[in-house]
Amino acid sequence: MFISFEGTEGVGKTTLIRKIHQHFEEQGKQVVLTREPGGTPLAEQIRSMLLAVNHNENMSHDTELLLIYAARAQHLQQVILPALESNKIVLSDRFTDASFAYQCSGRGLSQDKLQLLNQNFVSSMPEVTFWLDAPIELGMNRARERGALDRFEQEKLSFFTKVREGYETLWKAEPERIKRLDATQSPDQVFEQALQYLA
């Protein structure tokens, strides 16, 4: 089983993933916990490039998208596909939906570019995607409380409003796969809501 977790900054994805990871392990199931961009040493290096705040050079939107897919291709080949072939449960903090929400909806890149990359480099999709949804201001306040903001977290509220709209578009288009979770609830309540979709 392949499960991904999506949402804007500070909505509690990491907390939910840990709870679901523990839930499956208590059932004796083998679980692989991973994230995007990242998940392998090479992909984590790409992640560092993507998140770094560079005051000397602005990363172009196309470069950002291609770096994310370079990391994703490595992640799929080295982590996700081998785990699924071994009948392990894969829990991924973000996957392709994040690229639609952030790069297409947020940055304004063409969906055709994303579709071309998905067709050529993405051979497996999650069976279930949890979209943790909360007001942008709430999530950003939580992100600020964590400390220094990365390159994405420093974006304006208007950017994250577009990102959230992107997630909403996906949710409405694929309600069977994408499950919206009310991230204004307590972490335990969000976890209980998620479990209902995994029963």
From Swiss-Prot:
Q: Name one GO cellular component term.
A: cytosol
* Biological process terms in GO annotation: dTDP biosynthetic process; dTTP biosynthetic process; dUDP biosynthetic process
Task: Summarize where ATP binds, as residue positions.
Answer: G7, T8, E9, G10, V11, G12, K13, T14
Q: Which reaction does it catalyse?
A: dTMP + ATP = dTDP + ADP
By its UniProt entry, which Gene3D superfamilies does this protein fall under?
P-loop containing nucleotide triphosphate hydrolases (3.40.50.300)
Instruction: Give the CDD domains listed for this entry.
Output: TMPK (cd01672)
Q: Does the keyword ATP-binding apply?
A: yes
Do you know which Pfam families this protein is assigned to?
Thymidylate_kin (PF02223)
- Alphabetically ordered keywords of this record: ATP-binding, Kinase, Nucleotide biosynthesis, Nucleotide-binding, Transferase
The record's top EC class is transferase
Enzyme Commission (EC) number: 2.7.4.9
GO MF terms on file?
ATP binding; dTMP kinase activity
- Family affiliation: Belongs to the thymidylate kinase family.
Q: What does this protein do?
A: Phosphorylation of dTMP to form dTDP in both de novo and salvage pathways of dTTP synthesis.
UniProt xrefs under PANTHER family: THYMIDYLATE KINASE, UMP-CMP KINASE 2, MITOCHONDRIAL
Name this protein carries in UniProt: Thymidylate kinase
